[in-house]
Amino acid sequence: MTKLTKRMRNIREKVEVTKDYEINEAIALLKELATANFNESVDVAVNLGIDARKSDQNVRGATVLPHGTGRNVRVAVFTQGANAEAAKEAGADLVGMEDLAELVKKGEMNFDVVVASPDAMRVVGQLGTILGPRGLMPNPKVGTVTPNVAQAVKNAKAGQVRYRNDKNGIIHTTIGKVDFDGAQLKENLESLLVALKKAKPTSAKGVFLKKVSISTTMGAGVSLDQSTLETTTK
């Protein structure tokens, strides 16, 4: 029989697996149980009321969290001319066209997000087999293929998260770090849930946000009482 670590025993003792926690109580509990020797991420899993087998019910998009993610995001931009200068001024870490593509082909990918202007897709399209499996391929649905590359760079730097349901209809993403204060994590989560509700497919029927759980990188996962969250869409 596998011996439980001290951390796992602590989690089992303090987390009620059948309970839906009030949001502030849940955040306080996660912080208490986050004992790793690094600043853990706070992640969220949202079970959606969709049939993921149907393409018209899949949910994909991006939203900027009000308090960011706590990550230092490096952004590469494929563009040229005036757009290249605008991207640099917006804080892009790498900007180019064929020269940037050559770096990617060599495996030099020191970036977390790729943005491209529409005219650059002829170059980026050749990198699909490299960028695609890493989740880096630019896509207009998440705002990374756009004429306004400067704004896309600013969004990425400001804490934009991308979301896409998996085959089980679940969204997995991050809402910050353990060292964020409780109000910041709550507001980030509520902002994400509002964005998801706005992205609800018209063909999806019934309850859309079926279950919301938050967890830390190395710690506990707790289910939330959604009535304690403000997710009214305007």
UniProtKB/Swiss-Prot annotation:
Keywords: Repressor, Ribonucleoprotein, Ribosomal protein, RNA-binding, rRNA-binding, Translation regulation, tRNA-binding
Gene3D superfamilies, sorted: 3.30.190.20, 3.40.50.790
GO BP, sorted A to Z: regulation of translation; translation
Pfam families: Ribosomal_L1
The keyword Transit peptide belongs to this UniProt entry's keyword annotation: no
Molecular function GO terms recorded: rRNA binding; structural constituent of ribosome; tRNA binding
GO annotations of cellular component type: cytosolic large ribosomal subunit
CDD domains: Ribosomal_L1 (cd00403)
Signal peptide region: none
Stored PROSITE patterns: RIBOSOMAL_L1
Keyword Lipid metabolism listed: no
Annotated NCBIfam families: rplA_bact
Subunit structure and binding partners: Part of the 50S ribosomal subunit.
Role description: Binds directly to 23S rRNA. The L1 stalk is quite mobile in the ribosome, and is involved in E site tRNA release.
Protein name from the UniProt record: Large ribosomal subunit protein uL1
Species for this entry: Aliivibrio salmonicida (strain LFI1238) (Vibrio salmonicida (strain LFI1238))
Lineage: Bacteria, Pseudomonadati, Pseudomonadota, Gammaproteobacteria, Vibrionales
